Amino acid sequence: MRCFFRWTKSFVTAPWSLIFILFTIQYEYGSGKKYGGPCGGRNCSVCQCFPEKGSRGHPGPLGPQGPIGPLGPLGPIGIPGEKGERGDSGSPGPPGEKGDKGPTGVPGFPGVDGVPGHPGPPGPRGKPGVDGYNGSRGDPGYPGERGAPGPGGPPGQPGENGEKGRSVYITGGVKGIQGDRGDPGPPGLPGSRGAQGSPGPMGHAGAPGLAGPIGHPGSPGLKGNPATGLKGQRGEPGEVGQRGPPGPTLLVQPPDLSIYKGEKGVKGMPGMIGPPGPPGRKGAPGVGIKGEKGIPGFPGPRGEPGSHGPPGFPGFKGIQGAAGEPGLFGFLGPKGDLGDRGYPGPPGILLTPAPPLKGVPGDPGPPGYYGEIGDVGLPGPPGPPGRPGETCPGMMGPPGPPGVPGPPGFPGEAGVPGRLDCAPGKPGKPGLPGLPGAPGPEGPPGSDVIYCRPGCPGPMGEKGKVGPPGRRGAKGAKGNKGLCTCPPGPMGPPGPPGPPGRQGSKGDLGLPGWHGEKGDPGQPGAEGPPGPPGRPGAMGPPGHKGEKGDMVISRVKGQKGERGLDGPPGFPGPHGQDGGDGRPGERGDPGPRGDHKDAAPGERGLPGLPGPPGRTGPEGPPGLGFPGPPGQRGLPGEPGRPGTRGFDGTKGQKGDSILCNVSYPGKPGLPGLDGPPGLKGFPGPPGAPGMRCPDGQKGQRGKPGMSGIPGPPGFRGDMGDPGIKGEKGTSPIGPPGPPGSPGKDGQKGIPGDPAFGDPGPPGERGLPGAPGMKGQKGHPGCPGAGGPPGIPGSPGLKGPKGREGSRGFPGIPGSPGHSCERGAPGIPGQPGLPGTPGDPGAPGWKGQPGDMGPSGPAGMKGLPGLPGLPGADGLRGPPGIPGPNGEDGLPGLPGLKGLPGLPGFPGFPGERGKPGPDGEPGRKGEVGEKGWPGLKGDLGERGAKGDRGLPGDAGEAVTSRKGEPGDAGPPGDGGFSGERGDKGSSGMRGGRGDPGRDGLPGLHRGQPGIDGPPGPPGPPGPPGSPGLRGVIGFPGFPGDQGDPGSPGPPGFPGDDGARGPKGYKGDPASQCGPPGPKGEPGSPGYQGRTGVPGEKGFPGDEGPRGPPGRPGQPGSFGPPGCPGDPGMPGLKGHPGEVGDPGPRGDAGDFGRPGPAGVKGPLGSPGLNGLHGLKGEKGTKGASGLLEMGPPGPMGMPGQKGEKGDPGSPGISPPGLPGEKGFPGPPGRPGPPGPAGAPGRAAKGDIPDPGPPGDRGPPGPDGPRGVPGPPGSPGNVDLLKGDPGDCGLPGPPGSRGPPGPPGCQGPPGCDGKDGQKGPMGLPGLPGPPGLPGAPGEKGLPGPPGRKGPVGPPGCRGEPGPPADVDSCPRIPGLPGVPGPRGPEGAMGEPGRRGLPGPGCKGEPGPDGRRGQDGIPGSPGPPGRKGDTGEAGCPGAPGPPGPTGDPGPKGFGPGSLSGFLLVLHSQTDQEPACPVGMPRLWTGYSLLYMEGQEKAHNQDLGLAGSCLPVFSTLPFAYCNIHQVCHYAQRNDRSYWLSSAAPLPMMPLSEEEIRSYISRCAVCEAPAQAVAVHSQDQSIPPCPRTWRSLWIGYSFLMHTGAGDQGGGQALMSPGSCLEDFRAAPFVECQGRQGTCHFFANEYSFWLTTVNPDLQFASGPSPDTLKEVQAQRRKISRCQVCMKHS
């Protein structure tokens, strides 16, 4: 137990444990990559020296941005995002194209009576009617209204003079106020009758209007007839007027004198007629008595006709009148409807044939003989992919190209000691490997730590291969500011307003302004001066006649007075209008300059527009202030461009070395003591039951087994117990050689003979023998050392017990066992060191069936099933209406296989095949003749370091100078990736390197390459013979899937497909089949197109050695050789002086690119980037060359970046110590030491030196010598030194030419099925397949659309004689022939007529195809055919008058093309009603929802019956030419069957029984639904028949607030069965269907007619089905019955 803990402790604390842990971490983080070679490619034979790590260098400059990486692999499908917000309504789309003509609608119900129309226009003048009888005398009319007063009469005769009035003394009277108007005079006679007015329409009586203003008096009327009335009596005196105002007092003399009356003056001239006065007010009514009624006047002239009165009531039916005269002949009527088909007429007369018209096509002739084999046709379309190929082994392939040189072999055994007295001979050929020696005695115990003296620095090695990528480095320092080539950003917001500007200088005078608008009126002006006297006015109108003045007594006539004084000034007049604007004045003089001493600053102006961006200013000084807190981490930047190569780093510090006492093997020692017991091993198979426990006798030693393949070196073990001290070796101890790099594993050696034979002389290398027979199966090798533990696999199924294994070889005798009691079980040990993976075991027996796994995800849609058996022939349908010329049909099924074609042209030589499998080793060949000397071979790979040889003879003391430098060694193995180094300083730009070699093929397949250019077109095939044109058939329904055709010729290469998903692992093959017999040679194929270049193949095996070449030209000087073996150590020299530092070397060239790295694991998805600003469209660049341009010059180094934040601690534990730095340059040589002792001459003059003494303890390290000066160049005369150890690997050579192909190996066994590869390119189209068997006859297609108008038909046969008795014959005049009318549209087909004595019937339906006959020999060419029958007569003449309708035909009419849809609401297809052919069946689609919007289907239209069911029968496409399917939560809703509601969503086959089936039938008329809104079944209208009764289904909603409804006229609104959940929701993306809680169906309810307009309905909840059905309205679907 204690030992165990000690062991565990030593294991955990040993440095190997750290390596072990790191190895597992490396395995974890590196996706399990292993590095070839022991110890992961490191040199384990040297002591591990771990120098301290140097201080961190300055950060290098930021490298240029790397190129954009290749397109990453397609990421995994993301989880569905949350439901997006509802998008804005889209803009209305463009108007769609005009749709097709819809089907004929159902005849509508009669409309409501229209409103009476407007009165029509007056008819033409009628003929004069017959004179009527005199009418009876009418009743007297009502008295008319009072007429208007007549005009004033003429003045009467003058009256007689009255009596003289009395004289009056007037004392200044005034004119009195006008008296009241007198009474009106008597009415005048009526005027003459005016002209007849046009009659007005009869208006409604209006309300009385308001009184209008008094109009101006009219002009006087015409003079009336002279009145004959008598003078009336004088009226009574008027009333006394009011008192007038007092007048001015006139002094009149009193009448003391007598006044004389003057003489009557002369009558004045009549005055001018005054203007008419204003009309007087209406007078009071007169007082006269009403006169008697006058006698009736003469009849007036005939009035104009009145307007149309309202229509009268209908009169009684009159007596039948006498027959009228025959009318005139009318115009020709339009062409009548087509009558029913008449009886067949008598045969027509044979006319002379019209030559140009072509005859009617004849009946099809008998089948012709087989023609000769035609020319090879063009390649057919690509066939379907063929079945997977057989898994038998193929024939032996051609020899592959030579393989890559093998790995270096293991170190050879030590050679035989050379003779001490001979000069060194040529190096011998390598001997056969010796037997393993016996174990030596144990050496002395080693000290814990051995110090090595540091060796001399070796020459600078070549650059090693690029190692695998290192772990991710720490976060780098913050980069310098990048150059911004971004476009300028958007314009910023306006800045703050600037300070007010200084006062500007005075501006120039402006141009004169426009005229201003009219100003407001001014204030009233001051009083103006009096104006000048006006001109005399025009003559005024004459005044009214004055009244007669009173008599004035005047004595004297006065003189004319003088002019009076001016009157007082008048009042100011009104304002005059404003005057017009004046003309602009002349320009004034400039005014004096203003004073701005005390001017206040103006108000702040508006902010100015932003100025253009300024030029970049110089960089400002650093700002003040403390540095702010570090900002949040920014988004990851774009990857930078790859930097140019940096300068080489400075030389590292010298590392410490550990001295290794290398001891060489002594004689074989005694056997060592038993080691401590090992760790507990893995449990072995159960052994056979043991005997009792007495010790057994020691067995005999077994024969040595064959040496196994050495396993990889194990981890370093604990220090062993000290062994027995060995005897002193005989060899003098040489100085330690430089450590060699470990060689790769050599090939397995031939087992030596157990007897110790001397090694024989090596033979010449033989030529490769012919391939040998396959050897027997070899014995199993010894088990290798344990490999690392594999990743635990998933537990397999339990297999049955295996067969008993064969008995193993006897083991090595074990140590004697201890007492036989069984010990207590130990604590479980630590996990053992990893073992190597074992060979794959034989395939196990098939295990027991496992438990059922969880349901997998829904699979892809399966392949179409096998074709069903052909159904029975259906009844023959009625002939369809002739359809239009159909479009080109679908491509036909492949025909029967044709006879084999003629051999094609020889193909171009194919590409080189992939290397074949390794051949079995051949028999040993006989020794060939010696070949010519070959050229100097390439340097071989470095061999493993051999064991130290015995000391050779002392050489002749030839004072040789330093040898030429040795050849460069092969490249070393790639090391582990080191920690990320510190950033180096930036290097100068190197020259462009040579192109690197092709890298090894990557582990993962790269993205598909760009399509290559298309190959040259193949030669054109010979033209095929043209076929006869067939009759275009109706488009059939799609037939069953035919048998697969034979493969077509290769098609054109398709675009590379997207990479398919990884296939499932196939079942292992049971065992290899024997190779099949050799097939017949195929016929040469067509010339293929140039294929897509294949991926680069793996290197093939090494081919046989070619014949020796002719001696070549002598090669150029080789590279200097390796340094020679170290000489004996000289005496220690004096320390030299310190040398000057050497000049700095130039930067080296760029290295070649390393091999492609292993593809890393998928990174986690990055954050979404911000939306970039929209860039401006760039100009199109010139197309670049195909190659990349040379890299640009290196930019100036940027400023040093700011110090970055400290990184978070890394995940990994501290890494391994870095590798030792490169050796420094050699120092100058020290001064020469004193001469050594003279060496022994070859002639034996000097005695042998004594044996060397024991070695003393190592002295302390001396101070480091000063490098000596460089030596002088050696002489060429002297001997060249022995070849030194191989140097470090040289640069990789250029790639050699491919070797010749190797021998063909036997076919290998079938491998297990590989994993499914990526999707291949589509194959080239195969040759045309065999013709398939003819399909079964399809169902009759639906009637096609109405075809175009056909050519004019032949003239019909004469019809039957008309029925003379039914109509009276009125002979008509012959009509004038009308002009030729346009060609009429094709009429509807007539009803089917009576069967006539028919001519030959139409050919019946095609019979089933007979078996192919034997092809006959070609017959002789036929005779020339007879002349065809006469063609049709010419175009028809102009149409005659409309014929009488024909007699009614017999038989059923053709169907009309109306469609009827039936939904069964079960999973059974419904049957069509009798007499209605079924067009198709399908599944009942109710509506679909896409993008959260529903689109409803009317269940009465054929679109609701989809022939194929899918949970998502649609995709959606956008304007970017991209379509998406099953990318959103789109849904479809289907009518459901009566299956019980499921608990879980339905998927796959479960769905079928829940979807209602439907059928589409052709009906003779349109069907409509009628609804009762109560529990009774509503009756169909008269002459309509019932199709089904049901329940009134109104509308439905599903997910969200979306849904639809049924038109109540549509048969879809009458479902035969009522269900609360009549439909099911299918979620397209999941492929499942379910009845969800948010599905609602809406049904018309029953309504009591008495409660139609009553208060609101009473709420109710119905849970029982019968109660629900009683509440739902009933309906019936009816169709017009003709």
Curated annotation (Swiss-Prot):
Its main location: secreted. Residues 56-255, 379-1453 are annotated as: Disordered. Residues 31-56 are annotated as: 7S domain. Prolines at the third position of the tripeptide repeating unit (G-X-Y) are hydroxylated in some or all of the chains. Type IV collagens contain numerous cysteine residues which are involved in inter- and intramolecular disulfide bonding. 12 of these, located in the NC1 domain, are conserved in all known type IV collagens. Keywords: Basement membrane, Collagen, Disulfide bond, Extracellular matrix, Glycoprotein, Hydroxylation, Repeat, Secreted, Signal. Residues 57-1451 are annotated as: Triple-helical region. One of its GO terms (molecular function) is extracellular matrix structural constituent. It is found in: Secreted, Extracellular space, Extracellular matrix, Basement membrane. A motif (Cell attachment site) lies at residues 86-88, 137-139, 181-183, 587-589, 593-595, 716-718, 980-982, 992-994, 1144-1146. Residues 396-410, 487-500, 609-621, 1011-1025, 1223-1235, 1248-1272, 1289-1304, 1340-1351, 1435-1444 have a biased composition (Pro residues). Residues 1457-1682 form the Collagen IV NC1 domain. Residues 969-978 have a biased composition (Gly residues). Residues 103-116, 411-426, 632-647, 665-682, 742-758, 857-902, 998-1010, 1034-1044 have a biased composition (Low complexity). GO terms for cellular component: basement membrane; collagen type IV trimer; collagen-containing extracellular matrix; extracellular region. Residues 1-32 form the signal peptide. Type IV collagen is the major structural component of glomerular basement membranes (GBM), forming a 'chicken-wire' meshwork together with laminins, proteoglycans and entactin/nidogen. This is Collagen alpha-4(IV) chain.
